Amino acid sequence: RTNRNRNKITAKEQRELREKTIGIVGLSVGSAFAMSLAMERTCGALKVADFDDLELSNLNRIQTGIKNLGLPKWIAISRAIAEVDPYFEVEVYSRGLTSSNASDFFDGLDLVCDACDQVSAKALIRFEARKAEIPVLMETSDRGMLDIERYDQGVEGYLHGRISEEMLNDMMNANEWSPEFFNAFIDLSQASAR
């Protein structure tokens, strides 16, 4: 099924990638990442965390149909992955990423993708990734920014030094975004007008 990968990923690289486990927190935007990884088999297993149900407003970000409205996002995405590759391993965290399951979620990960909206989850991702020494990949829709935090290379601080220990703790206990938190993730002075 993946024989066309040979022109862009060598056989040796494919063998190495089969041993990798990638975590995705948030399955709206994260669903595209999950589907690409499954279609190309560019990792051996996925761990996905999302607690939300599929709503009509999600259909601009999730490639699915109205038949899946009301289902948990993880069910819709897991089914779509199984239709492409029924042998692809997907481990689901149906309550999303929480302080009670974060240690288990991060166990064995080689990379984590931050595709969630909750400020507390974003902070928890960075706290756990730094502890586990794995990179964080985050895409934001503002200006199409792709951010890579290399906690696997001994990086100090969080989000390239934009988040202090104190702010991270505040974020992990927050129920909503503050202007200060938002500015840490998207430099408001550089943000697009929209």
Task: Name every feature range the model reports, one short phrase each.
Residues V48-D85:
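Glycine-rich phosphate-binding loop and adjoining beta1-alpha1-beta2 segment
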Residues D110-R194:
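E1/E1-like adenylate-forming module used to activate ubiquitin-like modifiers
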Residues R1-I22:
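N-terminal charged helix/coil linker that caps or initiates catalytic domains
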Residues W74-D110, C116-A123:
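A structured beta-alpha segment of the ubiquitous adenosine-cofactor-binding alpha/beta core
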Residues R15, M35, D104, A123-F127:
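Alpha-helical segments flanking ligand/cofactor-binding loops in enzyme cores
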Residues R18-E55:
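Glycine-rich adenosine-cofactor-binding loop
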